[in-house]
Structure formats: structure tokens, C-alpha cells
A protein has these predicted regions:
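Accessory beta->alpha helical hairpin/"wing" motif in late/C-terminal subdomains of nucleic-acid enzymes
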Residues: 76-86
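Alpha-helix N-cap/helix-initiation sites
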Residues: 18-22, 40-41, 55, 76
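Short amphipathic alpha-helical interaction segments
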Residues: 52-66
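Short alpha-helical segments that sit at the start of domains
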Residues: 2-29
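Short, locally clustered residues in the helix-turn-helix/winged-helix DNA-binding domain
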Residues: 26-37, 91
Length: 107
């Protein structure tokens, strides 16, 4: 019985953990990449739903990413070459971290 209660608290704690800014940048670019298979742009509202974040937070991060030249934003949002490089590099780093985590758990 105690283990079940502990598990519920653990799940709630994990659910409340916030994404880092860099993770949210990656999630935003991933949402754009997934949504632009046939187009080269996507609306902010679509990104908001795919990233499961508030519109205010998304708008703030989109502006930061535009200032850092990761995205181009006019009426629609486009990923720059720098943004695609960031997405690719982050995916590689994330995969490396997951591999190391699996190795540690296996030992």
C-alpha cells in the first residue's frame, strides 16, 4: 500500500518538472519540422498545441529564437539553416545522453 502512494507522489513530481529553455526550443523546432512536411511554414497556434505550452510562453520563445536567428517569423514561422543545425545537434546530444543512461542502468 505504501509503495502505491509513493508511486503516485513520484508521478506527480515528474509531471510537474518543467522543460528547460533548450528543450522547449527543440520541441518547437520539432513541431515545425513535423508539421512542414509539405509546406515550409506553420502557424504559432499549431506549434502551441504540439508543444503543449501557453501562447504567451510560446510567443516569448519564438521571439527569442528569431533574435538568435534560429527561426524566421513574419506571418508564418520558418526554420533557418542555423535552426536546423541546432535541431540536429540537439537530437544527437540527447541520443548520447539516453545511451549513457541506459549503459549506467545496465551496470
Amino acid at each position: 500500500h505504501y509503495v502505491i502512494i509513493e508511486s503516485v507522489f513520484t508521478q506527480k513530481r515528474l509531471a510537474k518538472e518543467r522543460r528547460s529553455k533548450i528543450q522547449l526550443y527543440y520541441d518547437i523546432i520539432t513541431a515545425i519540422v513535423e508539421d512542414t512536411q509539405n509546406n515550409d511554414s506553420v502557424s504559432p497556434t499549431r506549434i502551441q498545441f504540439k508543444c503543449n505550452t501557453s501562447y504567451d510562453k510560446l510567443t516569448k520563445y519564438l521571439e527569442e529564437m528569431k533574435e538568435r536567428q534560429i527561426l524566421e517569423k513574419e506571418k508564418v514561422i520558418k526554420i533557418t539553416e542555423k535552426g536546423m543545425k541546432f535541431h540536429s545537434d540537439y537530437a544527437k546530444i540527447n541520443e548520447l545522453i539516453l545511451d549513457v543512461s541506459r549503459d549506467i542502468k545496465a551496470t
